Every structure is written in structure tokens, then in C-alpha cells.
């Protein structure tokens, strides 16, 4: 019989409170759960709790299967609407992939769907995107997103890329974080396998940022892969893993071509890429899960939604500037399994140096700064990556108890839904949300920027209780 873990119970309680919240600005909420924390069960528990029709969206076939199976395990009844499964059936509980339902929002609305649940909500949940358009067709009362990585890497032509929290960028549909289970709590409660890090030397001189500045160019990634003799080093590390008793190894590489080159060097290995036919992919993964195949090399797939608790070895040769990709790849091996005492993670792309160990990561609503991702006391979000790092001590503001004074010549809002309104008529919850959108451009065509900054300073004082 399924017994929920304490963090799953707390997440469910926070979701329940969110569903009862009638604040119109609190429609889109994010639940943060580490890799291996059992998001599928939290989704299933939420669906069970609801008394109205619900739509569950996940980006891949693998995640859909995983989430659907967990709900059925708990005794639920549901249907699947997905071309990947060759079944398209709507019901009061529907599990789906976005591409299959993007044009049937009206049909889903007619079912009476009031709640939408989105797994891996950091992925393609931007305003104006497929999922956003679908939500607008359905018009639910609440949208609940779940993810291990509530961040988005956002480019800027003038300042370079910034890593932003999902609720602090105007490009994301989500505006609040309603629950966080920290990685350190999962570890302290014994729900992660002990990670053995192997941080191999990496020369990054060949890497070049792409035009948006949010990642490295594909060509420079391949060149760096080759300059570091990565194929040979993967084989060497794989052999070391096997000699240590590692039973199952998943390898991430930067291209389809490199996957097949490596396949020729590791006896008995198999390859899965985003070009592999679904039927062949299923057969390969079944052999891997059954222990027939010891090593699977992959590109463009298996980063999320691949549930293999016995996996005890990952070699990551995929160079990335994305924390989400790094964490998802590393997270494939943290799940608990019988007779699995430790998990070996080998990094050949400089990713550990770039992001640190995942155990040190926390997502925190810090004092009057708001939500941020931290590694210890170091802030990792909310400012251009080219700038010097910021720490918690830099974020602590001295609050003046004197009533704030609007020293700006600007007295009314000049944009958005409250355009033309005097400040006194604008809800503080909206002002607070607006100030937390790190990507929002504060500009007024009729006033100099110094006046805009004075206005913004006054807004900050208002939400801090000085107005």
C-alpha cells in the first residue's frame, strides 16, 4: 500500500491551500520537487483530491506513461490523449502531451476542466507559447506547475544572459511559488542515493557563446569535445566504473554522430537518440532496464522522464550552460533501489565547475529580496551572468521606518492593466509581483530614466510597508 513521504504530504497541503486561494493574481503556482522526490505521486495525490475534471500535461511520452501509471496504481481511472500512444480519449481525468491537444482547448473546456497540472513546467511555459494559448482556450481557475528546476535562462542583447526564477520573469506564465522541497531535506531524510562525484579535467578554451548568450554554440561544443579527447576518456571512465562494480551506465554525448562513434568503442552498448524510432527506443530501453544491456549512449533524450531507480552510473559528456540540463542529467541516478549503495557521476564537460554540486542548491524566498536560487550563500539568479557574483549579505536591505515619499514626477501607472490609474488604486500584490519580474523593462517615453527609478524606489517602499 502506498504511503506518501512527508514532503509529498506537505506539498499536497500547500497545493490544497493554493486551490482555495481566491486571489486573482495567484492563478499560476509552481511546486518545486527535486529529482527523485516522487513528482508523479504528488500529481496523482492532487488529482485524487480534486472534485472537478482535471487535465495533466507532460512534455514527453515517457513522463506521461510514468505519471499515468502512478495514478492508476493509486486506484484512479483516467484516459490518455496523445498521438505517441495512438490513443486520443478525453475524460474527467486526462493525461496528455501538449502537441496532441493544442487545438482542442474548447473540447477540454466543455468537459468542465477547472484545474490544469503541468509537469516539467520550466519547459516551454512561456507567454504566447503553445501551452499558454491552450490555457487561454480552456480558462481554468488554477494552473499548477511542477519542476525540479524553477529557472529559465533568458538572453539579453545588451547585458548577456541571466538565469531567472520562473516567477520573476515576465516571459513565464507562472507568477508564484507555492511549495519547495529542498534537495538537502530529501538527502537528510534518506531519499537520495549517495552521489560519488568524479570531476574530470576540462579545457574550455574552445567554447564560444551563441548569439543570444544563453548557451554555447553547437560547433564549439563539438570542437571542445574533440579537443579534450572526450571519446577516449569516456571509454576509460566507463571501464573504471565497471571495475568498481557499477551495473548500469547511462552516457550523455553532444550529438548523434558522437553517440554512434562511441558505440563502436564500447562493446555491448546501445544508442538512443531523438532520431530513434519509438518502437526501437522502447526495445532498447527495455533491455537496459532488464539488465541485458549494460550501457546506453544517448543524445537529445532521456534527460527527463526516464525512471530507472537501479541506474548507478552516469557519464555526462554533454557540455552545457543550462543549470536545468545539468541537474536533470545528474538527477537520473539519485533514486533509491534495492542493493544500490552509491551512484557514480562522471562529468567530462566542466559542468560541476560551472554549477557546483547539486546538494548545495536551495530555492529560497530570502528576506525582502524575494525568490532566488542559491548555492550556499551565493545567489545564482536574477542578474546577468557576466557580472560579479552576489551573495546574501549583498541582498539585505536596511528598512527605514519613516513613511516613504514619492519623489518622482510620475504619479500614475502608464502600462499594463492598471494604465492611467493613480498608485493608490493599484493593488500592492500586483506592484509586488511586478517588481519581482527581473526581465521587465522600466521605461517611460515622457520622462527621463532617473524619474522612472525614483518611481520604482517608491513602489518598493510601498510593498515593504512604508507607504
Tell me what each language-model feature is.
Residues 1-32:
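Conserved pre-motif I regulatory segment
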Residues 175-250:
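Conserved interdomain linker/interface between the two RecA-like ATPase lobes of SF2 helicase motors
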Residues 179-193, 337-401:
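A conserved SF2-helicase RecA2
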Residues 23-46, 252:
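Walker A/P-loop
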Residues 65, 80-90, 250, 259-261, ...:
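Conserved helicase ATPase core of P-loop NTP-dependent helicases/translocases
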Residues 123-195:
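Post-DEXD/H (motif II) to motif III coupling segment of the RecA-like Helicase ATP-binding lobe
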Residues 99-105, 124, 274-367:
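Conserved RecA-like P-loop NTPase helicase motor core
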Residues 41-73, 256:
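Conserved Walker A/P-loop ATP-binding site and its immediately adjacent core
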Amino acid at each position: 500500500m502506498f504511503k506518501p513521504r512527508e514532503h509529498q504530504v506537505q506539498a499536497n497541503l500547500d497545493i490544497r491551500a493554493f486551490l482555495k486561494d481566491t486571489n486573482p493574481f495567484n492563478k499560476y503556482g509552481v511546486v518545486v520537487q527535486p529529482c527523485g522526490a516522487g513528482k508523479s505521486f504528488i500529481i496523482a495525490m492532487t488529482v485524487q483530491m480534486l472534485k472537478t475534471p482535471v487535465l495533466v500535461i507532460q512534455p514527453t511520452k515517457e513522463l506521461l506513461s510514468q505519471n499515468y501509471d502512478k495514478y492508476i496504481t493509486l486506484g484512479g481511472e483516467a484516459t490518455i490523449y496523445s498521438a505517441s500512444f495512438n490513443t486520443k480519449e478525453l475524460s474527467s481525468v486526462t493525461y496528455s502531451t501538449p502537441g496532441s491537444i493544442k487545438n482542442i482547448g474548447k473540447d477540454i473546456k466543455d468537459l468542465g476542466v477547472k484545474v490544469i497540472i503541468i509537469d516539467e513546467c520550466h519547459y516551454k511555459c512561456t507567454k504566447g507559447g503553445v501551452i499558454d494559448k491552450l490555457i487561454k482556450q480552456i480558462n481554468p481557475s488554477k494552473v499548477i506547475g511542477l519542476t525540479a528546476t524553477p529557472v529559465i535562462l533568458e538572453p539579453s542583447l545588451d547585458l548577456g544572459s541571466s538565469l531567472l526564477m520562473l516567477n520573476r520573469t515576465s516571459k513565464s506564465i507562472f507568477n508564484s511559488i507555492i511549495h519547495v522541497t529542498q534537495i538537502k531535506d530529501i538527502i537528510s531524510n534518506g531519499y537520495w542515493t549517495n552521489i560519488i562525484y568524479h570531476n574530470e579535467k576540462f579545457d574550455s578554451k574552445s567554447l564560444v557563446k551563441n548569439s543570444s548568450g544563453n548557451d554555447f554554440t553547437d560547433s564549439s561544443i563539438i570542437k571542445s569535445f574533440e579537443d579534450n579527447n572526450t571519446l577516449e576518456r569516456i571509454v576509460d571512465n566507463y571501464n573504471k566504473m565497471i571495475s568498481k562494480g557499477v551495473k548500469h551506465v547511462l552516457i550523455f554525448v553532444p550529438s548523434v554522430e558522437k553517440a554512434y562513434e562511441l558505440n563502436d568503442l564500447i562493446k555491448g552498448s546501445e544508442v538512443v537518440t531523438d532520431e530513434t524510432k519509438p518502437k526501437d527506443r522502447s526495445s532498447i530501453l527495455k533491455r537496459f532496464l532488464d539488465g541485458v544491456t549494460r550501457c546506453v549512449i544517448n543524445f537529445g533524450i532521456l534527460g527527463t522522464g526516464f525512471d530507472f531507480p537501479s541506474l548507478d552510473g552516469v557519464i555526462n559528456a554533454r557540455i552545457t550552460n543550462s543549470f536545468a540540463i545539468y541537474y536533470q542529467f545528474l538527477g537520473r541516478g539519485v533514486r533509491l533501489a534495492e542493493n544500490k549503495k552509491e551512484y557514480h557521476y562522471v562529468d567530462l564537460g566542466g559542468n560541476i565547475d560551472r554549477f557546483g554540486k547539486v546538494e548545495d542548491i536551495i530555492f529560497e524566498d530570502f528576506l525582502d529580496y524575494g525568490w532566488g536560487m542559491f548555492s550556499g550563500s551565493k545567489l545564482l539568479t536574477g542578474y546577468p551572468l557576466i557580472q560579479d557574483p552576489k551573495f546574501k549579505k549583498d541582498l539585505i536591505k536596511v528598512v527605514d521606518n519613516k513613511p516613504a515619499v514619492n519623489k518622482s514626477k510620475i504619479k500614475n501607472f502608464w502600462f499594463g492593466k492598471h494604465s492611467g490609474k493613480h498608485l493608490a488604486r493599484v493593488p500592492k500584490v500586483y506592484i509586488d509581483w511586478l517588481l519581482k519580474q527581473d526581465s521587465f523593462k522600466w521605461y517611460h517615453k515622457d520622462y527621463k530614466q532617473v524619474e522612472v527609478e525614483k518611481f520604482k524606489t517608491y513602489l518598493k517602499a510601498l510593498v515593504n510597508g512604508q507607504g
